[in-house]
Swiss-Prot record:
Origin species: Oryctolagus cuniculus
UniProt-annotated stretches for the region Framework-2: 35-49
Name listed for the protein in its UniProt record: Ig kappa chain V region K-25
Start and end residues of each stretch annotated as Complementarity-determining-3: 89-97
GO cellular component: immunoglobulin complex
Comment field (misc): Residues 109-139 of the constant region are identical with the corresponding residues of rabbit 4135 kappa chain.
Region: Complementarity-determining-2, residue numbers: 50-56
Database matches in InterPro entries: Ig-like_dom, Ig-like_dom_sf, Ig-like_fold, Ig_sub, Ig_V-set, IgV_Light_Chain
S-S bonds: none
Positions of region (Framework-4): 98-107
Single Gene Ontology BP annotation: adaptive immune response
Keywords, in A-Z order: Adaptive immunity, Immunity, Immunoglobulin
């Protein structure tokens, strides 16, 4: 099994600011890391896959980086609509693993 540890658990920033979320894997997962955004009552939305590739239709304000065991999601020029919980995700041997989530609170 792969354990994904996200930090921080919660972060607050103002509109126009920048937020950085880290995800640490318990073993080398190369670049097999995705980031999802989830809002209450909605399914998760894929933002980034293969660590740094932006999913179709996703704003370039979202940037993923890292490889191996250390990964980062950066959200710049924050908007109120970015308020959500963000999860990192990977897979191994047909199993899917998620981080514990990071709640992003946007002050506007």
């Amino acid at each position: 099994a792969v354990e994904l540890t996200q930090t921080p658990a919660s972060v607050e920033a103002a509109v126009g600011g920048t937020v950085t979320i880290k995800c640490q894997a318990s073993q080398b997962i190369y670049s097999y890391l995705s980031w999802y955004q989830q809002k209450p009552g909605q399914p998760p939305k894929l933002l980034i896959y293969k660590a740094s590739t932006l999913a179709s239709g996703v704003s370039s304000r979202f940037k993923g980086s890292g490889s191996g065991t250390e990964f980062t999601l950066t959200i710049s020029d924050l908007z109120c609509a970015d308020a959500a919980t963000y999860y990192c995700q990977t897979y191994s041997y047909s199993s899917t693993y998620f981080g514990g989530g990071t709640e992003v609170v946007v002050k506007g």
